[in-house]
């Protein structure tokens, strides 16, 4: 079974086993909803979310199996994982980062290969995609309809229209 990272435990919060989680998921409301099944660390120990709530740029999460600060303290630095089968389907036009990374980026008009999608960041309203060309030079593209014209996950191709000054 494949597992994917959804966050990392960075600290404890309170005395009853609640932990502070730095997110690596775009869907914290789903991932940290009461009753959700997640896995901890390399040994993929299964845990059940008892409660989850936003807290500043983090989430505070309580697992049913972790009931005090001593147990929670041992989890600092632990990755939180979700199994592939628990991820669920995404709506059309929404993709997991792992599906996009490594895609060839093509000019929509000419079909010419511009580079490869090598990184994705989410600094604000829109994601930005790092594209690295064959010479190793990279530049960023905003993930907006005016730039990204189509995504074909099966072919691992993204077609874009480069606006003036993006490259």
Curated annotation (Swiss-Prot):
Coiled coil located at which positions? none
Q: Which UniProt keywords apply?
A: Chaperone, Cytoplasm, Ribosome biogenesis, rRNA processing
Q: By its UniProt entry, which PANTHER family does this protein fall under? A: RIBOSOME MATURATION FACTOR RIMM (PTHR33692:SF1)
A molecular-function term among this protein's GO annotations: ribosome binding
Q: What does this protein do?
A: An accessory protein needed during the final step in the assembly of 30S ribosomal subunit, possibly for assembly of the head region. Essential for efficient processing of 16S rRNA. May be needed both before and after RbfA during the maturation of 16S rRNA. It has affinity for free ribosomal 30S subunits but not for 70S ribosomes.
Which InterPro entries does this one have? PRC_barrel-like_sf, PRC_RimM, RimM, RimM_N, RimM_N_sf, Transl_B-barrel_sf
Subunit info here reads: Binds ribosomal protein uS19.
Q: What is the name of the protein in this document? A: Ribosome maturation factor RimM
Q: Which GO terms describe its cellular component?
A: cytoplasm; ribosome
* Pfam families on file: PRC_RimM, RimM
- Boundaries of every PRC barrel domain copy: 92-166
Question: Which family is it part of?
Answer: Belongs to the RimM family.
Signal peptide feature range = none
């Amino acid at each position: 079974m494949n597992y994917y990272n959804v966050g990392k435990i960075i600290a404890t919060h309170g005395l009853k086993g609640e932990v502070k989680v730095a997110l690596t998921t775009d869907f914290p409301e789903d991932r940290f909803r009461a009753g959700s099944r997640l896995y901890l660390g390399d040994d993929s120990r299964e845990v059940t979310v008892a409660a989850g709530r936003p807290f500043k740029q983090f989430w505070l999460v309580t697992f049913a199996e972790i009931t005090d600060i001593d147990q929670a303290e041992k989890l600092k630095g632990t990755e939180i994982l979700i199994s592939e089968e628990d991820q669920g389907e995404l709506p059309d036009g929404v993709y997991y980062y792992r599906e996009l990374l490594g895609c060839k980026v093509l000019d929509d008009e000419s079909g010419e290969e511009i580079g490869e999608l090598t990184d994705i960041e989410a600094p604000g309203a829109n994601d930005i995609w790092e594209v690295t060309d064959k010479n190793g030079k990279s530049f960023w593209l905003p993930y907006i309809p005016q730039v990204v014209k189509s995504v074909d996950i099966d072919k691992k191709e993204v077609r874009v229209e480069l606006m003036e000054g993006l490259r």
